[in-house]
Amino acid sequence: MAGDESPTAAELRNQVRYLEAEVAALRRRLLEHPADGRSLESRLSETQASLASVTAQNERLAETLREAREKIIALKEEVDRLAQPPSGFGTFLGRNDDDTLDVFTGGRKLRVAASPSVDLDALKLGQELMLNEALNVVEACDFEVVGDVVMLKELLADGERALVIAQADEERVVRLASPLLDQALRAGDSLLLEPRSGYVYEKIPKSEVEELVLEEVPDIDYTQIGGLFGQIEQIRDAVEMPYLHKDLFLEHELKPPKGVLLYGPPGCGKTLIAKAVANSLAKKVAEKTGVEGRSFFLNIKGPELLNKYVGETERHIRLVFQRAREKASEGMPVIVFFDEMDSLFRTRGSGVSSDVENTIVPQLLSEIDGVEGLENVIVIGASNREDMIDPAILRPGRLDVKIKIERPDAEAARDIFSKYLTTTLPLHADDVNEFGGDRRECVNGMIQRTVERMYTEADENRFLEVTYANGDKEVLYFKDFNSGAMIQNIVDRAKKMAIKAFLDDNQKGLRVQHLLQACVDEFKENEDLPNTTNPDDWARISGKKGERIVYIRTLISGKQGTEPGRSIDTATNTGQYL
């Protein structure tokens, strides 16, 4: 151990021994010469102090040496670690009888040995492995998490390989990694491909169809829809009856309709009815069979289905109906709903800048005709320009049932108001007292007065004067352009007014004056919306059919009286469709 110490430490040790010997000598002299005791004790104290100082210095030096030794060891380990050759990675392809492994690394397929610390039985196809400088497996890693996204075209017969479509429609055969071997894969799924090894690792939840459809049925039923009693009865006869009474249809040799077209002006409940159909159908089937029922509502967003690349829109349509067939094959009723159907399936040859409808329409026709062999699929389309949809789609045998969703009349408006004005709302005490404290009668009275205000053919309700091609003129009132969406908006306006009144004057509750003022504000807000540049197109979308309209003049009552009408030649604000 002395050989490991520095010369300074040895000198200090010798000095300590020398001082200890001197102390012993002084003690002996003190015993021999008591008279010199005082001076000797003083020297003894000095010597002991020197001894303690040297001992402390020796301990500090020893601690410094220990720290230096630990730093040297740590630096040596760091140097050894940095000097190690780099480790490579490879993809596990298989295990051989002699426990060697087939690995794909560096663009080559190699057969390598494995370290005893690697559990060979736990290795899975496609797993990433760490290799040392001798290309031997030293550690098992996780699966690859990045790569290219490809679309599955079909699974091969062996169940371990698949045909996929990569970029630029390139077809490629790939291997399925272990995580995918037990998963249910179907054509159109997006998969993660590691292009060098040729393995697909996981299913990417990014199906193009899933971006365009809503599979789960919204929680909407017919009781939430007001003013459409006849239309609801028609669609129930067209959709629910064939599923609930299949035996009767077979007995009468009657085929269920393949599709339903809901058409009419905007904001009148076409989409709402379509959403309620699947929900009602699932409940009816559950009541009949006693089994928890479930139906699917594929809500196709028409404009988003369009794609600038040739053939992509048609492929999306095929995937939509493929999804519908899969769900229907499980015995579940499936409704494929095309909202704004005229945006996708226009009359062929009517395109201004493109002829995309020449291929989209035939694709839908072939899919609808293909639905004939399925029992649980029905197509529902909604449009406010049914005149622009290709006639081949509207013919019997495809969209068999056509239901017009009219603008609400006074009776329908009362029913719609009752969906939004309920007794649970905070009502003003003065209004309730007018009806003897009966909240139900108060609400009914509010609805009655509001409907009378909206549907009265008074000068204050005049909206437009239209001129037809034959020279006839007609005055249109706001009631002619009323809709369920407008009624909901009026109620919402009144509720906001009630909130502001409570914040300003501390008067809580909805009043009939709020509803009447909301009607005025709603009418005033819509006064600039009629498109006077193309009056006939505007009239068709607004639900005004018949003789062609060539001129529109607004008849809105302004603050100082009737504002001047606007002709199609001088109009500068084309506005939006009402």
From Swiss-Prot:
GO terms for molecular function: ATP binding; ATP hydrolysis activity. Residues 8-84 form a coiled coil. Residues 577-578 are annotated as: Docks into pockets in the proteasome alpha-ring. GO terms for biological process: modification-dependent protein catabolic process; proteasomal protein catabolic process. SMART domains: AAA (SM00382). ATP binds at G267, C268, G269, K270, T271, L272. Transmembrane segments: none annotated. GO terms for cellular component: proteasome complex. Pathway: Protein degradation; proteasomal Pup-dependent pathway. PROSITE patterns: AAA. Keywords: ATP-binding, Chaperone, Coiled coil, Nucleotide-binding, Proteasome. NCBIfam families: pup_AAA. Consists of three main regions, an N-terminal coiled-coil domain that binds to protein Pup and functions as a docking station, an interdomain involved in ARC hexamerization, and a C-terminal ATPase domain of the AAA type. ATPase which is responsible for recognizing, binding, unfolding and translocation of pupylated proteins into the bacterial 20S proteasome core particle. May be essential for opening the gate of the 20S proteasome via an interaction with its C-terminus, thereby allowing substrate entry and access to the site of proteolysis. Thus, the C-termini of the proteasomal ATPase may function like a 'key in a lock' to induce gate opening and therefore regulate proteolysis. Homohexamer. Assembles into a hexameric ring structure that caps the 20S proteasome core. Strongly interacts with the prokaryotic ubiquitin-like protein Pup through a hydrophobic interface; the interacting region of ARC lies in its N-terminal coiled-coil domain. There is one Pup binding site per ARC hexamer ring. Upon ATP-binding, the C-terminus of ARC interacts with the alpha-rings of the proteasome core, possibly by binding to the intersubunit pockets. PANTHER family: AAA-FAMILY ATPASE (PTHR23077), PROTEASOME-ASSOCIATED ATPASE (PTHR23077:SF144). Belongs to the AAA ATPase family. This is Proteasome-associated ATPase. It comes from Kribbella flavida (strain DSM 17836 / JCM 10339 / NBRC 14399). The lineage of its organism: Bacteria, Bacillati, Actinomycetota, Actinomycetes, Propionibacteriales.
